[in-house]
């Protein structure tokens, strides 16, 4: 039987906000929760369906994969999310059921309701923020980063037990990780107070990790920064997050890239912009000027009579996009610079030049003539 659309299951629109999805889930979870419908297989089936839909849509990465590829993007048979089954819903939804049923419900979910053996948990993902230069972003490079993280204990190999021993099945919950308790007319499951939901306990803890199965360590990792990466993008390093629990897979490391402000260029996608001052003589007479680019120097011709603020486009002098062989453009915004701190001879030359312009009429300054024509009525 084909799976229903996750948005349809929760009764929300595809553009629903996180809060709308959460509210819809809480309402349906309350309605179909097994503790409210003992022995009702239909309610249990609806609850599993609602739980699975919320698990996918409450996680931004899983939701993006589902929006793009549908169920195939999150199919557990293809290594996607959702493979934990009914017993593991508390890991994703403990906050929800903590609100609905109180702290006891989170433990009941963690215990898994009749499963045999301890629950397996995937390790947490890690985030690492990294600042690079515009040049590094444009060309790409390989680097190393040092990331503080929990790693599996090398003495007990992550079991938490002293070498030569092993964790034992919890006698209080018989390995289920939960115990059933009654609160008023509710009969709910609660996290086992002895094993804290793992289903096992360690009679002889490892002396190195003190039973945790993991130790804090700083890892040195190789990171490849791809050419064309932009500010805010993330690089995924699979399996370099925190170790899993009870043999679960490790999480992933996400390296978030931030690009430092450049002293010359401003980036706009694959294009670059720069402000360039030019002498007023070059603007008036025209000429060839050189500009910097990320690949060296380039030159272009400024036509005579160039005005301040004029923009020139140099094709292909920007940045090649991520996984693209086509580079953006460089936009040079020229600013005509007025000379300062003139000597007397220089001032005299400019006065003579100004006199010659006046004698030549307004054709030398068309913008000034147009402006004065528009405002002359204010001076009448």
UniProtKB/Swiss-Prot annotation:
GO BP field: chaperone cofactor-dependent protein refolding; DNA replication; protein refolding; response to heat
The chain positions of domain J read 5-70
The stretches annotated as CXXCXGXG motif repeats are: 153-160, 170-177, 192-199, 206-213
- Needed cofactors: Zn(2+)
Q: Which family does it belong to?
A: Belongs to the DnaJ family.
Query: Record's domain comment?
Result: The J domain is necessary and sufficient to stimulate DnaK ATPase activity. Zinc center 1 plays an important role in the autonomous, DnaK-independent chaperone activity of DnaJ. Zinc center 2 is essential for interaction with DnaK and for DnaJ activity.
Kindly provide the name given to this protein in its UniProt entry: Chaperone protein DnaJ
